[in-house]
Amino acid sequence: MTSMFRQSTNRLTVWLFALCLLFPFSKLSSAWRNTATQDKAFSISAVSKASPDSIMPERLTFPDSVALAAPEAAGRSVSSLVAYLKQHLSTDDQLARAIYTWVSRNIKYNVYITYTSRNEEADETKEIQKILSERKGICQDYALLFKALVKEAGMDAYVIDGYNRRDGALLPDPHEWCAAKVSGKWYMFDPTWGAGFVENYQFIPSPNHRFCKLLPDTLLKTHMPFDPMFQFRERPLSYEEFDTGVVDEQRSVPVFYWADTLALYARQDTLERLVSVRQRMLSNGRSNDLVYYMLELTSNNIRIAGYQKILNAYNMAMDLQGKATDAINEFVRYRNKAFEPLKPDAEIQAMVDVPEELINRADSAINSIRTAPERYREPILKLRDQIMEVATTVYKHKLFLRQYFKLPVKQRKGMFK
């Protein structure tokens, strides 16, 4: 009996491109600049641009002092910075405050970079290390770093995509901030707005804690999440209500069980999350240009995530098929030697059980691909046939062992004649 040689398979290649900003926002609809009506207003207050001279000095807390005293070496990685903070601070509240302080004071806003969509499959670890090394970034970088530090400290956190209203008008670009679960309750943090402001294309440091640990409804006066779930409200505001500052009391809105939705969101993969986000956005009322842009971006990311999911399943199936082939070939070589030197029965059985388990996983992975673009179907079908071939071979050897173990030990050698 000869070994079943491993067949070569061309790896399915899918070129995935990270999406950048799809549409410029230099010219905005005049509707964005409507001031809030006084009747039934949601109290969307203006956040005026402030200079260091116009802000009352803040009284530093103990967590602030700990953050400001962090040695340079501690800020070289997420783990080392959180380890330093935990040497001096113990509660979620203290750690969240110190992290906000450190990020807002140590990261400089990069005025030469604009908002771009982050690839859902991007390597966050590399991005965060780049931020820590360069000590500069934009809102995405502030939010990503804050989230990473908070999660390292043991709290749940999310980066939130959205847009802003200031001085009665919508700001022209998307923005990112964070939600963190501090001491069992969700709060909002915007370390970018806590770092300073941009004037005449220059970043003016103006560290403050006005956007540190705010209740969701408080930050909702100026920050509108694209995903209604991140309002953390049973009655989310529609985009139009936020844009105008007027709550439509006649608008029929079913109770939104955001906590259950968030729990499901935490369990979803990238594709499932994107699909559910898009559905929630579409159900949240009339869109403005920014929301429309994000809907288009999300639709594109859904397509990319779908391709990536196919690629991941294919590569997993191919890897498992290869391992199963190697494992069953090892058994074949041992069988060709008439089980010499003799191994314990359990060890011999495992030589077939292992490839069987591997090929079953490969079969599950390849069959998880329900639909695929036409150009990917041929390699998928080819791999499926190869998996079936290995599975058949494994089953034949499994039947052989079943008969082998039924015989008395002295008669087993006859199985190899």
Question: Where is each model-derived feature located?
Answer:
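Hydrophobic/aromatic-rich core segments of domains that either
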Residues: 101, 141-212
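Mixed-charge, low-complexity segments
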Residues: 14, 24-34, 72-73, 85, ...
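Active-site rim recognition segments
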Residues: 56, 113-116, 126, 180-258
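Generic detector of well-ordered alpha-helical segments enriched in charged/polar residues
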Residues: 79-86, 97-100, 104, 129, ...
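Bacterial Sec-dependent N-terminal signal peptides
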Residues: 1-37
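Secondary-structure boundary elements
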Residues: 38-134, 138
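Short glycine/serine- and small hydrophobic-enriched flexible loop segments
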Residues: 105, 148, 329-332
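Alpha-helical transition-metal enzyme core signature, strongest for iron centers
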Residues: 103, 139, 143, 355, ...
